[in-house]
Amino acid sequence: MAPNIRKSHPLLKMINNSLIDLPTPSNISAWWNFGSLLAVCLITQILTGLLLAMHYTADTTLAFSSVAHTCRNVQYGWLIRNLHANGASFFFICIFLHIGRGLYYGSYLYKETWNTGVILLLTLMATAFVGYVLPWGQMSFWGATVITNLFSAIPYIGQTLVEWAWGGFSVDNPTLTRFFALHFLLPFVIAGITIIHLTFLHESGSNNPLGISSNSDKIPFHPYYSIKDILGLALMFIPFLTLTLFSPNFLGDPENFSPANPLVTPPHIKPEWYFLFAYAILRSIPNKLGGVLALAASVLILLLIPFLHKSKQRTMTFRPLSQTLFWLLVANLLILTWIGSQPVEHPFIIIGQMASLSYFSILLILFPMIGTLENKILNY
């Protein structure tokens, strides 16, 4: 029998073992589609970003004009820019759902996979932040000023660190240049960490909705899950293209249509929608260093999740109390997102503080408590 090149070629066999002959649990649901959707988002963002970079000028006097030029004069430039801007939103929608799936089904017990995933989230957030500065509109400039300024809360080295990051005494041309360099570099770093993420995942194999071993019943990834992923892809691309083609500026801030002006502060400085939950937590603490620590903790808390798992069952499939708590957490995050978009005044301040407190309470105190309680109820 002739050797199958797919299984013998040094490069093709790696692809084969990851995407074709990969043994996959037979019962994973549509919630397992988001990994491949994230890969597609990354590829889309790199391609559109590369095309945009060909027409972009990283200079404070030209950046805003170069983006306007791309939209007006470059063939399909408007489309490339809108795909890239809204592609970021869909990237975050997918990653939030992917993390939510991991929380619900106990996927975080694969610690290496989970930790590399958290690193991917942090890198994605950094990439999105530096990218938002590049069009050099009002919200770009003031967003960069406010967020980089947070580093000055670090004791002793803070101010030096901020001026070093800025390349001067304020957000200016050096800042824009280095942010462009970082925004170009980081997606490739994300691609590299993604490969590490997958390597760790394929060491153990995928989890499944029941949280039990799948070893007795595995099926090849292709054609079963390749076709399922393509369906998921189509279902994601329909709303993505609808948003991009019908209301491309729906998620953007009107302030960003004005060129950056250091002398005029916008009435409400706020980040893109996908950072609002963390921004609300930052603002809920009336102390600069405390706010920065809470902001960092709001994402880094994910690293603690594997250690807070007290249940004898892996997933929440058969744990109604934990399920209730999980959806409470989701509602809580939606409230935080809403609060982050509101001005700092009554009643939003107290709502934000309550939501921030309950966010940390649910994750750090209530989840382990309910897990232990469920064990007792089930006589474990």
Swiss-Prot record:
Cofactor(s) listed: heme b
Protein family according to the UniProt entry: Belongs to the cytochrome b family.
Cofactor note: Binds 2 heme b groups non-covalently.
GO cellular component: mitochondrial inner membrane; respiratory chain complex III
PROSITE patterns named in the record: CYTB_CTER, CYTB_NTER
Encoding gene per record: MT-CYB
Protein name as annotated: Cytochrome b
SUPFAM superfamilies for the chain: a domain/subunit of cytochrome bc1 complex (Ubiquinol-cytochrome c reductase), Transmembrane di-heme cytochromes
Annotated source species: Alectoris graeca (Rock partridge)
Pfam families found in the cross-reference section: Cytochrom_B_C (PF00032), Cytochrome_B (PF00033)
